[in-house]
């Protein structure tokens, strides 16, 4: 304030009530601190992914999540990609004696650039910051396949067919993968984006360690079986609705599966033939014809629902 007054730049001074932010984990006051950071021109990178979704080259399932995607992408701001952390992909930038920046693939390449600029050998200091984790994650669809080298795996598996993800990271992860895929390979990284529900506790609250409401799936599997948990989650996987998971629901589907298992055991006891065959059986008894027709109709409905990502209906 004294400096502003001395420069005659202070217009007004008054008391204000402020909301003081505290860290979730540390519990201490968060103080804003201006520092130099690296930024990415996200607006430029967002153009092609937006076109891809609008032209239906990339589809969201359910379609309603397109609105969330467009809302983020149409209002995107410069992306701060540097982080002051101990672990991560270190930013490939080195500083000369006068803070001149040299960006290179490795230190050897940076030294060559610096020598060319200064006309002599100089000591370089590497930027200590690392990349934002979502920057690294955005490279996942092709970095895992050997990129930047062109090889069999990259040609065969990029782009992929389906990405399965939660709605809470559409912007943080999905959008970044789309931006990098279009920028570096000129192809959408995936054709369909299936946005599944969040699994919450029985009261609809988001699970967190701090709340103490985390349901351990391994304990549910140990107690009620993996099939019971799978059946529960699939039956509740209605598009656009979160899952309110409780042990009672898992127990109920376990009991239902027990009935199916008992029916199967009954057929085995009566020496029913379960040999796999592609041949259509010859059926003469009317009731068996009806059973077979119902089976084929059910099979077709299940296959269509799975293709349409309606796992709850399947």
Model-based region annotation:
Residues 1-98, 205, 211-256, 261, ...:
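Residue patterns forming the tRNA-binding/recognition surfaces of aminoacyl-tRNA synthetases
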Residues 61-62, 159, 281, 285:
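Generic structural signal for alpha-helix starts
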Residues 89, 187-193, 268-282:
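Short, glycine/acidic-rich hinge or "gate" loops at secondary-structure transitions
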Residues 172, 188, 251, 309-314:
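Short, solvent-exposed positions on alpha-helices
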């Amino acid at each position: 304030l004294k400096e502003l007054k001395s420069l005659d730049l202070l217009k007004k001074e008054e008391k204000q009530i402020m909301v003081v932010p505290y860290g979730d984990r540390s519990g201490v006051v968060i103080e804003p601190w201006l520092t130099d950071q690296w930024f990415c021109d996200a607006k430029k990178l967002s153009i092609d992914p937006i076109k891809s979704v609008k032209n239906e080259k990339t589809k969201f399932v359910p379609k309603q999540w397109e609105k969330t995607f467009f809302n983020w992408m149409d209002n995107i701001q410069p992306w701060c990609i540097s982080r002051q952390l101990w672990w991560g992909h270190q930013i490939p930038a080195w500083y000369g004696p006068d803070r001149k920046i040299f960006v290179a693939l490795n230190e050897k390449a940076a030294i060559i650039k610096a020598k060319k600029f200064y006309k002599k050998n100089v000591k370089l200091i590497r930027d200590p910051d690392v990349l934002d984790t979502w920057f690294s994650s955005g490279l996942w669809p092709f970095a895992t396949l050997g990129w930047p080298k062109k090889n069999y795996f990259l040609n065969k598996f990029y782009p992929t067919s389906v990405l399965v993800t939660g709605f809470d990271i559409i912007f943080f992860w999905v959008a970044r993968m789309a931006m990098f895929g279009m920028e570096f390979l000129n192809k959408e990284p995936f054709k369909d984006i299936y946005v599944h529900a969040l699994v919450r506790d029985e009261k609809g609250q988001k699970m967190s360690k701090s709340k103490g409401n985390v349901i351990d799936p391994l304990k549910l599997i140990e107690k009620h079986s993996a099939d019971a948990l799978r059946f529960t989650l699939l039956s509740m996987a209605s598009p656009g609705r979160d899952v309110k998971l409780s042990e009672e629901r898992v127990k109920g589907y376990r009991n239902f599966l027990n009935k199916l298992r008992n029916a199967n055991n009954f057929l085995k006891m009566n020496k029913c033939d379960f040999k796999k065959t592609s041949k259509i059986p010859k059926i003469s008894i009317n009731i068996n014809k009806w059973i077979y027709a119902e089976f084929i109709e059910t099979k077709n409905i299940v296959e269509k629902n799975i293709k349409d990502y309606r796992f709850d209906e399947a």
